[in-house]
């Protein structure tokens, strides 16, 4: 388990979160990649942040959970960056992503954020 991962996410919750990311991508707005995700957290526009667990080197995303905590933004870990990238609409993996407008996934994003808080 990477240093920055401080709680385990059940597989069914991860699947639900990735599905919500896909809906948000299609009906709302999503930021993809470490830099875009970091900026959305800092600007207060992120509603839910995704961080991949298989990022090498770990330092690329190590700051994101701490920053999200500081700004009060819920975040979830995803096992594979390929899964995260595909859910965000990329043909390649993504180390991080953020939902900035949930669109039709609004209720799902809130539900996932609540479940993640319970895990912590």
From Swiss-Prot:
Family annotation (Pfam families): Ribosomal_L7Ae (PF01248)
Gene3D superfamilies: 3.30.1330.30
Example of a GO MF term: structural constituent of ribosome
GO biological process: ribosome biogenesis; translation; tRNA 5'-leader removal
Keyword Cytoplasm: yes
InterPro entries: eL8/uL1-like (IPR050257), Ribosomal_eL30-like_sf (IPR029064), Ribosomal_eL8-like_CS (IPR004037), Ribosomal_eL8/eL30/eS12/Gad45 (IPR004038), Ribosomal_eL8/Nhp2 (IPR018492), Ribosomal_eL8_arc (IPR022481)
Keywords: Cytoplasm, Ribonucleoprotein, Ribosomal protein, RNA-binding, rRNA-binding, tRNA processing
Cellular component GO terms held in the UniProt record: cytoplasm; ribonucleoprotein complex; ribosome
Keyword Transmembrane helix: no
Subcellular localization, as worded in the UniProt entry: Cytoplasm
Function: Multifunctional RNA-binding protein that recognizes the K-turn motif in ribosomal RNA, the RNA component of RNase P, box H/ACA, box C/D and box C'/D' sRNAs.
Assigned protein family: Belongs to the eukaryotic ribosomal protein eL8 family.
HAMAP family in the cross-refs: Ribosomal_eL8 (MF_00326)
Subunit structure and binding partners: Part of the 50S ribosomal subunit. Interacts with protein L15e. Probably part of the RNase P complex.
Protein name per Swiss-Prot or TrEMBL: Large ribosomal subunit protein eL8
Highest classification ranks of the organism: Archaea, Methanobacteriati, Methanobacteriota, Stenosarchaea group, Halobacteria
């Amino acid at each position: 388990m990477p240093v920055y991962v401080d709680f385990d996410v059940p597989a069914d919750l991860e699947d639900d979160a990735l599905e919500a990311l896909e809906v948000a991508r299609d009906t709302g707005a999503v930021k993809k990649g470490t830099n875009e995700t970091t900026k959305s957290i800092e600007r207060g526009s992120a509603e839910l942040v995704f961080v991949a667990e298989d990022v090498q080197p770990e330092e690329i995303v190590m700051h994101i959970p701490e920053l999200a905590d500081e700004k009060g933004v819920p975040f979830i870990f995803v096992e594979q960056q390929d899964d995260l990238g595909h859910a965000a609409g990329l043909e390649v993996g993504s180390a991080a992503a953020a939902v900035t407008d949930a669109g039709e996934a609004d209720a799902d994003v809130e539900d996932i954020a609540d479940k993640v808080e319970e895990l912590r």
